[in-house]
């Protein structure tokens, strides 16, 4: 999965402008529309399903940069 595809998916899911998505974006309710722990896990699940990837170390994901570093291709 390339970073552009991740940004596109992230932007659509969270309804956030692509220009605001940077590696230091903190994934919390101040920055993400309708953020909750359940919604975050739904996002992770949708990401894994749609792109056939696995997210490792989910407990250590606090920023967009953390997210992009922990995506592992299943292929």
Where are these regions (language model features)?
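Phosphopantetheine-dependent thiolation modules in NRPS/PKS and related acyl-activating systems
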Residues: 1-75
């Amino acid at each position: 999965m390339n970073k552009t595809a991740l940004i596109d998916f992230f932007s659509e899911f969270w309804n956030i402008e692509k220009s605001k998505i940077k590696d230091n974006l903190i994934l919390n309710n101040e920055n993400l529309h309708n953020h909750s722990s359940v919604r975050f896990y739904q996002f992770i699940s949708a990401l894994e399903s749609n792109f056939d990837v696995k997210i490792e170390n989910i407990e250590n994901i606090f920023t967009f940069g953390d997210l992009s570093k922990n995506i592992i291709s299943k292929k």
